[in-house]
Swiss-Prot record:
Location within or outside the cell: Cytoplasm
Tree of life domain: Bacteria
Any Gene Ontology CC annotation: exodeoxyribonuclease VII complex
Species annotation: Limosilactobacillus reuteri (strain DSM 20016) (Lactobacillus reuteri)
Keyword DNA repair: no
Keywords recorded for this protein, A-Z: Cytoplasm, Exonuclease, Hydrolase, Nuclease
Name the UniProt record assigns to this protein: Exodeoxyribonuclease 7 large subunit
Alphabetical GO biological process terms: DNA catabolic process
Amino acid sequence: MDRSQYLTVSELTKYLKMKFDRDPYLHTVYLTGELSNFRLRQKHQYFSLKDDNAVIDAVMFEHQFRKIKFTPEQGMKVCVVGHVSLYEKSGRYQIYIDRMEPDGLGSLYLAFEQLKKKLSAEGLFNLPKKQIPMFPKRIAVVTSIDGAVIRDINTTVRRRYPIAQVVLYPTVVQGDKAAADIARQINRANDRGDFDTLIIGRGGGSMEDLWPFNEEVVARAIANSKIPVISSVGHETDTTIADLVADQRAATPTAAAELATPVKLNDALMTLKDDQNRLLNTMRTKINFDRQQLNKQLQSYIFQQPTRLYENYAQKVDQLTQQLGQAAQNKMQELQMNVERLSGRLTAASPLHRVQQQEQLVDQLKKQLVTASLASQNEKKQQVTTLIKQLDSLSPLKIMSRGYTYVTSDEKVVNHASQLTVGQNVHLHFDDGEVQAEIKKVKEH
């Protein structure tokens, strides 16, 4: 047999994985199916996609799963995008998912309704609304540094109530990182503690553009704010989760500034910050240039798909973590059984236990001895009684009482007639006495 013709399982698996990874049709796969075996995990998600005739294993790593706006559920029909590869450890092919959205109903709309239902059940929309101060000294604004929102708010405040100070907390208002940044700036303004009113807002846009203001982290930051919050997000027809939680909603940034300030005052101070605006324009130009340079660097392959370098390792770490937890649990059970077994043996070998056993044995022997002694005494009494009866039945006196006598001559018992002679004196013994007689005649048989 030529063994060189045979492959090992590992070699065959590596070859098949290479075929999967090099197939351009499997690099980007668009797939629709029903979620099966889905159970929400803390980090990476492992589940299956199925239709009426087939099933495929699926993996979605933590950094990709966090980008999903809705909450996947068992049995939900979804559309996914990912790449297909072979997991060498199990020898099974699976799809590594990069994006997921519901099949049919839009993912953002579904996520909006899910969060709205959740927060409504918690009563977050029905909390007591804080009063907006009529004469604010300081107004915090959480919005983009280079959008029209801050310009409109500044213009309106200078026109209506120029003695109020507007403090900008610049934030990203669009993209994956925007929600966390908005919430962080709301918390920063609250930590400062000397603001009368807080305005959050951005201009109009699509539902995707306005989505950061529909995130739970922003809603909870607004609800927890000690400063009264005015929300101005999108156009008048747009309604976000932030609008529902805020103390007051404004249709536009200008309307938000009007709600935050009293009736119009002198417009004379509107030009006081021209120099500051020119400086800000210069800074914006520099920031935009640097942002363009950064985007060019981020377009490289290593930044586009860095996660593929460690996907298999991340899955293996999850499996090993699960095995370690199971092994620790088994070891604890084994140790507990050993402790219980040794405890039983120690109890059995205890001197106190043996003394108790011996005491019980002594008590049993005492009882047996008393029982045997009484039985022996009764038996001996019966034997003595029987012997007495036997002796009594054999006693000469007993016989003599029935009319018998015995004869003596010279104090010797006469047993035979041949021992006597005529004229010999003898004594006849009765049970109640004796008499003396003389032999008159001897007759032998």
